[in-house]
From Swiss-Prot:
Protein's organism: Proechimys guairae (Guaira spiny rat)
Glycan-bearing residues: N34
Assembly and oligomerization: Monomer. Interacts with and forms tight 1:1 complexes with RNH1. Dimerization of two such complexes may occur. Interaction with RNH1 inhibits this protein.
Organismal lineage: Eukaryota, Metazoa, Chordata, Craniata, Vertebrata
The protein's name in its UniProt record: Ribonuclease pancreatic
GO CC annotations on file: extracellular region
């Protein structure tokens, strides 16, 4: 079974892909990373930074998670990310996404030993 840490990498890490202006990026990536198999995942964020940099966020700024848990961490620097949002006229299995490039801090939930990201909680405009 896929571990939470591996699932996080599959769903959110695209270190090789530089943030692309390709409008089809999300359509292609959501499919190739298996997020459109049983249904169209409505929203997903890809992070275009080295895995080690994303894992390091677990030791940065501790913040509360959206669900109230206390194991979330905000990156102390901006990261290049791509937000994928399902378009309103999408019908499974034809999942169509809007691709938007951003530079923001990311918030991830971490657990385990080694302590690694297992859930992407949010992205926020970096605090200046």
């Amino acid at each position: 079974k896929e571990s939470s840490a591996k699932k996080f990498q599959r769903q959110h890490i695209d270190s090789s892909g530089s943030p692309s202006t390709n409008p089809n990026y999300c359509n292609a990536m959501m499919k190739s990373r298996n997020m459109t198999q049983e249904r169209c995942k409505p929203v997903n964020t890809f992070v275009h930074e080295p895995l080690a940099d994303v894992q390091a966020v677990c030791f940065q700024k501790n913040v509360p998670c959206k669900n109230g848990q206390s194991n979330c961490y905000e990156s102390t620097s901006n990261m290049h990310i791509t937000d994928c949002r399902l378009t309103s006229n999408s019908k499974f299995p034809d999942c169509l996404y809007r691709t938007s490039q951003e530079e923001k801090s990311i918030i991830v939930a971490c657990e385990g030993n080694p302590y690694v990201p297992v859930h992407f909680d949010a992205s926020v405009a970096a605090s200046a």
